[in-house]
Amino acid sequence: MHKIQIKYEKIGEKNSDDYKYDFCFVGTAHPKKYKFIKKMSEQLKSIYPKQYIYFFFPSRIVYFYRKIRNKELHKAKYNEFNFQPLKGEKMNEIYEKSRCVLDSAKDGQIGLTIRVIGALGAKKKLITTNEDIVNYDFYCPENIYLYNGKFDLDNIFFKSKYKRIDNVIY
């Protein structure tokens, strides 16, 4: 974990306002996560049109099995998914070139996802479905938006730049 944090911190040190992507999502395509990320992506297209989404399945067999068994994936297209994990350097590049990170925790997940930790280290804004995030000391409404099924585009999150958090918390 320590090595990951150091890489994300280096990304945060380079932060600029020159973004290739308005947001990114890199993660395993769990059925409900897929559904939420797709829904968020669609709702954000008008203000965040430059999107990088990398849905990962560990194998094609898992993809076909889940597509048949999970209603959230019935309409999913094969070309939306990747069957090789994103390598570290490519992942760093995507985070570096993104304004914001999308996150959707799995059902029943307790605690933070790696995307939350990465966004904090890289000093990126974060949109998440994790309701518990407001209870953490690093929570800042300028940086973290709690998604509850729809977006309030007048929210301070969309009107402000990333606000640095106190190093004591970080």
Residue ranges and their predicted role:
Residues 101, 121, 125-170:
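Pol beta-like nucleotidyltransferase catalytic core
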